[in-house]
Amino acid sequence: GDRVMAKKQTGFLPAALVTGETKMDVQHEDIFGRIESLKNLAFETNSLPVQEMHALIDCLAEHFATEERLAQEAKVEFLVHGQEHVRNLRLLKKAVSELENGKLDRHTFLRYIEYWFEQHIADFDKRFAARLAEAKKTP
């Protein structure tokens, strides 16, 4: 398994989604871990406590706030990415309420949130991390 070590592979964060920005990667790792444990919970207990879902959304909101702070500190443009965060939180909260109303299956919800998060990192966070790294290099 030497080849696997080429890119820092952590527990839940796929190597392809490592951004190189430690603060972000640590939080991404934590969020993937939470999603994973919710998937396990959903299968083992055949239920998904609503407070767990709200906790996950709160965790994402905190993570978004961290990224926004990193952008401000580095003076990196964040408008579109920030708008995406606002839109994402609105959609995720809507999905949670559909889950609560029984309109949405919990397994579908967890697959959706995991897929969405992977896409968001690939489409937004990797580019953002690269811009942060650039900004750090520039005096």
Model-predicted segments: where are they?
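Small-residue-biased structural context
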Residues: 5-139
